[in-house]
């Protein structure tokens, strides 16, 4: 039974996504369906967590819009996410960046990772 579930899961996995981690700034292109129309909406922010594995893997992106913090959680392997663009790589020491919720302004800024 487990082998059957693994084969169904592996068929649903996407391979066209970039390797991103918490701390990275990403631009997520999301398909939004309004009535009978659909359009692509961009959500740009910092990845504050990546959780789960396989088909059930999700990631949460946080941005500040009009001085209000907005967090949105996306499944990694969903067809609703058109594409994920990696804007910058962040240099952080934690896997879950929940402490960014309390920080404001310059304190909430993440150092950019230097490629060497």
UniProtKB/Swiss-Prot annotation:
Q: InterPro entries given for it?
A: Ribosomal_bL19, Ribosomal_bL19_CS, Ribosomal_bL19_sf, Translation_prot_SH3-like_sf
Family from the record:
Belongs to the bacterial ribosomal protein bL19 family.
- Quick check: keyword Ribonucleoprotein in the entry? yes
The entry's keywords: Ribonucleoprotein, Ribosomal protein
Q: Does the keyword Ion transport apply?
A: no
User: Which species does the entry assign this protein to?
Assistant: Streptomyces avermitilis (strain ATCC 31267 / DSM 46492 / JCM 5070 / NBRC 14893 / NCIMB 12804 / NRRL 8165 / MA-4680)
Q: What protein name is recorded for this chain?
A: Large ribosomal subunit protein bL19
| Function per UniProt | This protein is located at the 30S-50S ribosomal subunit interface and may play a role in the structure and function of the aminoacyl-tRNA binding site.
Which Gene Ontology terms cover its molecular function? structural constituent of ribosome
